[in-house]
Curated annotation (Swiss-Prot):
The lineage of its organism: Bacteria, Thermotogati, Thermotogota, Thermotogae, Thermotogales. Pathway: Pyrimidine metabolism; dTTP biosynthesis. The keyword Signal does not apply. A motif (ThyX motif) lies at residues 78-88. This is Flavin-dependent thymidylate synthase. The gene is thyX. The keyword Nucleus does not apply.
Length: 216
């Protein structure tokens, strides 16, 4: 499952271990019990979420492949209870792929948005040209990359359990977060909802503190 985000980015589900019933099994083992009928299992998911018993949800694990601007990735990596592996600018030549914001991102600027985009594009072109010139001159990749701006796209793998994923959604699928990472959070939420519908529904009903997912 792959969802386009921003102008050139995406969120792709690579792997998932477990589902709603994984949390149910983990919770019932405390009482030496197994799965019951579907309605009781679903009510247990709601009970766990409503009362803040979140550890059973750690037994549901997702791995995502994400392509995002560097400045988005740096915000993302602040969510530490997860595992990350990122494209290396030391070992790979970085591709000419930069995020250019849509016109509505510029608000009440003193110059017209089209001129802002023109200035951003000019800096991007100049920096990448300099990067390539440095590489051609024999400068190591790890040094040449320092001239590239934060809107360069990077790619990374993110492995995260459902409990930590819900924390990510609480903080990033919210209007207080930067708009760009909001778009990624909404994409993550759509995948989460598809793979764990009971958990997602209970999360939105009892534990979600943001303001973007009520209509997703």
């Amino acid at each position: 499952m792959k969802i386009p985000v921003l102008d050139k980015g995406f969120v792709e589900l690579v792997d998932v271990m477990g589902n709603d019933l994984s949390a149910v099994r983990a919770a019932r083992v405390s009482f030496n019990m197994e799965l019951k009928d579907e309605e009781k299992d679903r009510r247990l998911v709601e009970y766990l979420m409503r009362h803040g018993h979140e550890s059973p949800f750690e037994h549901i694990v997702f791995t995502f492949h994400v392509k995002a601007p560097i400045f988005v990735a740096r915000q993302w990596f602040r969510h530490r209870i997860a595992s990350y592996n990122e494209l290396s600018g030391r070992y790979s030549k970085l591709t000419y792929e930069f995020y250019i914001p849509p016109l509505q991102r510029f608000g009440q600027t003193r110059i017209v948005p089209e001129k802002v985009i023109e200035k951003i594009s000019h800096v991007v072109n100049e920096s990448y040209q300099t990067y390539m010139e440095l590489l051609e001159a024999g400068v190591p990749r790890e040094v040449a990359r320092i001239v590239l701006p934060l809107n360069l796209y990077t790619r990374f793998y993110w492995t995260v359990n459902a409990r930590s994923l819900m924390n990510f959604l609480n903080l990033r699928a919210d209007s207080h977060a930067q708009w760009e990472i909001q778009q990624y959070a909404v994409a993550i939420a759509k995948i989460f909802r598809e793979k764990c519908p009971w958990t997602y529904e209970a999360f939105i009903k009892y534990a979600y503190k943001g303001d973007l997912l009520r209509e997703v």
